[in-house]
A protein has these predicted regions:
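Conserved beta-strand-loop-alpha-helix junction that forms the acyl-donor binding cleft
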Residues: 10-13
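Conserved catalytic-loop position in the HRD/HxD motif
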Residues: 84
């Protein structure tokens, strides 16, 4: 058994696709509709057959409330890892990302936080090498 998918709820799937493929530089993996429902996932270009991130519309009131509560409490909806936070920070900033926290040293890592334009905060983490 393995983990293959996680979900981020978004207020606009097209806007989310633009952000996650443009600003974050991920790749679209799946995009198909079934009636009013759209299944949309992105993956890291470094691991195109690995973990998928579903960009799900927050049309369910519980999903919307959860998304808003996380954002209001400055909690990330998702966390991504990198080997070079400073380079990724500069690249995303150049592509228009709005960071709420620049790269910051914490106990075992460096982290940065940005808005995904769709109602979420995203944390990008570089683990420190000991």
């Amino acid at each position: 058994m393995k983990i293959k998918l996680t979900t981020v709820y978004v207020d606009d799937q097209e806007k989310a696709l633009h952000f996650y493929t443009g600003t974050m530089a991920f790749q679209k993996k799946a995009d198909f509709s079934n009636g009013p429902f759209r299944w949309l996932t992105v993956v890291s270009p470094e691991d195109p057959n690995g973990m998928e991130l579903q960009l799900a519309l927050n049309s369910n009131p519980a999903a919307k409330a959860w998304q808003q509560a996380l954002f209001q409490q400055s909690q990330p909806a998702a966390m991504f890892f990198t080997d070079n936070l400073q380079a990724d920070y500069e690249g995303m900033k150049a592509r228009g990302a709005e960071f709420t926290m620049p790269p910051t040293d914490v106990t075992a890592s460096k982290i940065a936080m940005l808005k995904d334009t769709c109602g979420n905060l995203i944390q990008v983490t570089e683990l420190k090498r000991w």
